[in-house]
């Protein structure tokens, strides 16, 4: 059974954006508390909990969910922790937003675990591949010197290749694909009504050729060019809007609980507002039908 693309009101778009921003921001803060492990030349750490934005971009409007997640990472994971790299942050912002947006577009049937799995892997893969290309480019163009890793060949391709594989296993599979395959079927049809949004039924009528148009490809390539240039400039110390205040150090490691509390309060507030909004819409429809 086909369906038309879901139409969102401005309030619904804002709620999806804030929900994604606060939830992924909160998740990023918790990853800061998790330990890192080193096995030989390989560093094992959780860069981000990919299943959260992946779940949101598949259940809701991909653009607002992806954009909200990227903003949440910057606000709660960088700015409030005093670790904002200025212009250099633009690279990660563009790459992650683009990757999650494409992942959301790839899913046309939320009842298909195969589609969910492919979209989840492709989303994280795009993010990691774009980041790898930029890192390799910085060394090849002589902008940054190669930092040799003991136990690995002194080759940027080998170093970045190992990093790419570990990120795909940890962020892509363990904390991306597996949780998403479990959560999406559980949440599908239950969380959307909270925002007054009709759950997606069947397949979207628009084909991938309509989504991935020439215009979309041109914009994506242009954004990647901007991301690469911004990272190159930041590496060459041509940077601005950096926010790394020294006074935050006096609060010690316990300071992280302040942004965690802020993100949690925003998330709970959005959920409460969404429930009230849904109830008011239901009440209005009931009165009209009566």
Where are these regions (language model features)?
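Alpha-helical transmembrane segments and their immediate juxtamembrane interface regions
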Residues: 23, 247-282
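Hydrophobic transmembrane alpha-helices
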Residues: 2-60, 64-65
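Membrane-embedded alpha-helical hairpins and interfacial helices in multi-pass inner-membrane proteins
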Residues: 33-45, 109-262
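Membrane-interface capping segments at transmembrane-helix boundaries
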Residues: 186-194, 273-286
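Interfacial aromatic-anchored transmembrane helix boundaries in multi-pass membrane proteins
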Residues: 30-43, 72-104
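Short, charged juxtamembrane terminal tails flanking transmembrane helices
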Residues: 1-7, 201, 280-290
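Membrane-helix interface "capping/anchor" motifs
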Residues: 56-69, 108-115
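Hydrophobic alpha-helical transmembrane segments
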Residues: 14, 18-22, 63, 67-71, ...
């Amino acid at each position: 059974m086909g369906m038309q693309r879901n139409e969102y009101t401005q309030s619904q778009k804002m709620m999806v954006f804030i929900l994604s921003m606060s939830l992924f921001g909160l998740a990023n803060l918790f990853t800061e508390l998790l330990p890192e492990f080193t096995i030989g030349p390989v560093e094992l750490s959780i860069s981000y909990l990919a299943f959260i934005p992946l779940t949101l971009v598949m259940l809701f409007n991909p653009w607002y969910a992806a954009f909200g997640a990227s903003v949440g990472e910057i606000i709660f994971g960088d700015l409030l922790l005093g670790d904002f790299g200025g212009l250099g942050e633009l690279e990660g912002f563009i790459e992650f937003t683009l990757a999650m947006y494409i992942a959301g577009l790839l899913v046309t049937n939320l009842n298909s675990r195969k589609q969910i799995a492919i979209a989840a892997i492709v989303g994280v893969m795009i993010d990691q591949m774009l980041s790898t290309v930029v890192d390799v480019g910085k060394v090849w163009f002589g902008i940054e010197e190669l930092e040799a890793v003991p136990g690995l060949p002194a080759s940027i391709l080998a170093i970045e290749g190992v990093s790419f594989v570990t990120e795909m296993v940890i962020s892509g599979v363990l904390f991306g694909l597996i949780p998403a395959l479990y959560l999406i079927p559980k949440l599908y049809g239950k969380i959307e009504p909270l925002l007054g949004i009709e759950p997606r039924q069947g397949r979207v009528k628009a084909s991938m050729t309509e989504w991935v148009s020439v215009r979309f490809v041109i914009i994506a390539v242009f954004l990647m060019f901007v991301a690469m240039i911004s990272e190159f400039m930041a590496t060459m110390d041509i940077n601005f809007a950096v926010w790394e205040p020294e006074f935050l150090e006096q609060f010690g490691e316990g300071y992280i609980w302040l942004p965690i509390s802020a993100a949690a309060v925003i998330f709970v507030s959005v959920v409460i507002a969404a429930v009230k909004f849904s109830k008011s819409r239901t009440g209005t429809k009931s009165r009209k039908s009566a």
